[in-house]
């Protein structure tokens, strides 16, 4: 069975058992009345069952309802169908004040019907020939308004300075100021120039997201013809059907696939209603993507440490034990489905590097947009500063130093012999984003 954990807030006067049973019925075989065609099938075989209810600690009228769905209710290899069944109608139920899907357990038999990520973590490292450290990226800013030629120039400067990747922002598609084909050409030129100068393999996430699946695949085909290593997709705004189609194309044609989670906070930000991001992350691993944005813990975007690390492990590891302290409601066995690299992005700069290296470890992408392009000397020195800071943190960690405690000191030491890093340290020494996380356990 697929198991689901729902956070249920019933209307006053509705007992939790009734609310849990209503959720199970509405998201499987039930309707509001008895119908004569019920007799033509075995409802016992197909209905969802609410098998356990527990109160939420510290909340007066909230309960966790556990529901089991028989596997026969779902089409194989279709995240779209899985979500249509489990969260399709039930969230508008009048008997509930609010409903949130906290976690899913996907059984191995169902996991096996998905291709998953086009390549996965190890194949990506082999393609890029980069080992033993997190990968470094940068989102090109301003996100909208640059011409293709100036955009390509910014890409080249960042890659030449020492970054592994640069990135289209999620809303860069094909607008009047910069058509997609022009952008692809100038970015490919920047890639090859930077590769020739540095001797390292470089990538730029070319955003293939489009208004139709056919147009999206057309853009991915053009990227492949240019010989670039990676394309990008906005998986929630583009939809799971489009995402899975692109993931299959990427595996067949040797392209890596970077996934942006634009629109996720509309779905996952409210604590008592919606879908938790750990569910969206699991769905993405099934649908397919080699990278996905996962929050930073330390930057400008929402994300509490233990909860973030919970779904980061769900993205990367093959087997994850149930651990309620990290918000993981079920043990999940991915039966060797390739892993996804978490991408830390949003309001981070060189002073965050020790914390990011310690929190996310080697299998991650650390993405500094403003933290590269905001360097007072320009893009390339900004990239140099980030690369020096990262190499210093990785070396210190490998020597057994405690990054959490000695992080600032490690960065200061490195800045003595890197003027680029020293300038970056000076610019961002006072910048903090300190707000309480909304998403707590």
Curated annotation (Swiss-Prot):
Species of origin: Polemonium reptans (Greek valerian)
Which GO molecular function annotation, any one, does this entry have? Answer: magnesium ion binding
Q: Quaternary structure?
A: Heterohexadecamer of 8 large chains and 8 small chains; disulfide-linked. The disulfide link is formed within the large subunit homodimers.
Which residues are modified to N6-carboxylysine? 167
* Cofactor binding, note field: Binds 1 Mg(2+) ion per subunit.
The family note in this entry says: Belongs to the RuBisCO large chain family. Type I subfamily.
Q: Which PROSITE patterns match?
A: RUBISCO_LARGE (PS00157)
GO cellular component terms attached to this protein's record: chloroplast
Q: What is this protein called?
A: Ribulose bisphosphate carboxylase large chain
> Which positions are catalytic residues?
141 (proton acceptor), 260 (proton acceptor)
Question: Which superkingdom?
Answer: Eukaryota
Provide the E.C. number(s) assigned to this enzyme.
4.1.1.39
Q: Which cofactors, if any, are listed as required?
A: Mg(2+)
UniProt-listed GO biological process terms? photorespiration; reductive pentose-phosphate cycle
The record's Pfam families line, in alphabetical order, gives: RuBisCO_large, RuBisCO_large_N
